[in-house]
A protein has these predicted regions:
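Alpha-helical segment proximal to the catalytic Tyr-Lys
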Residues: 40, 84-88, 151
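C-terminal helical subdomain
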Residues: 95, 117-149, 153, 160-162
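Active-site loop immediately N-terminal to the catalytic Tyr-X3-Lys motif
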Residues: 13, 60-66, 88, 130, ...
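Substrate-binding pocket helix/loop in short-chain dehydrogenase/reductase
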Residues: 10-12, 16-21, 111-112, 123
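Short C-terminal tail/terminal secondary-structure segment
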Residues: 6-9, 60, 142-143, 154-166
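Residue(s) in the substrate-gating loop at a strand-loop-helix junction
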Residues: 55
Length: 166
């Protein structure tokens, strides 16, 4: 489940109820709807793997994205809860927590405006490996979690973050 949305980076009390509802409808309800439709098929198949995309924001929140941060924290704990409940059905559930990627369509919302050099430098200074995540970084983590090599990996979140959450 790679559905995701955020409100513009700004003080929490300036986010409208409509924006709040959209963040939770996309970030959390998408997991519910995916599970409702996928779990019966995975049970019938004898098991499988569900991967939810959360965010480092659910572990190490930044100011200005309070409601987004909370929604991604909910994705993390929901993924762990699903792993515990669906394990007896041989269904593994994991999540991936990518760090900010300035090349996504939501980058300006996360940054609170255009991602100029000043904003890029501010974000980059918090990532010890010295670069942003890429779609390929996230895809590689998903490939591992979906593979037979991860057959005994369930209920974990992989931070694809260049050590930001350390």
């Amino acid at each position: 489940n790679n559905a995701g949305w955020t409100h513009r980076n700004r003080p929490m009390l300036e986010v409208s109820e409509e924006e709040f509802d959209k963040v939770y409808a996309i970030n959390m309800k998408s997991i519910y709807l995916s599970a409702i439709h996928a779990v019966p098929a995975l049970r019938q198949a004898g098991g499988g793997s569900i991967i939810n995309i959360a965010s480092t924001a659910g572990l190490r929140p930044r100011p200005g994205l309070t409601w987004y941060n909370g929604s991604k924290g909910a994705v993390i704990i929901t993924s762990k809860s699903m792993a515990a409940e669906l394990g007896p059905d041989n269904i593994r559930v994991n999540c991936i927590n990518p760090v900010f990627n300035p090349d996504t369509g939501l980058a300006a919302e996360f940054a609170g405006g255009p991602v100029d050099e000043t904003r890029r430098a501010k974000f980059l200074a918090t990532i010890p490996l010295g670069r942003f995540s890429t779609a390929l970084d996230v895809a590689n983590a998903a490939l591992y979690l979906a593979s037979d090599e991860a057959a005994f990996v369930s209920g974990v979140c992989i931070e694809v973050d260049g050590a930001r959450c350390v």
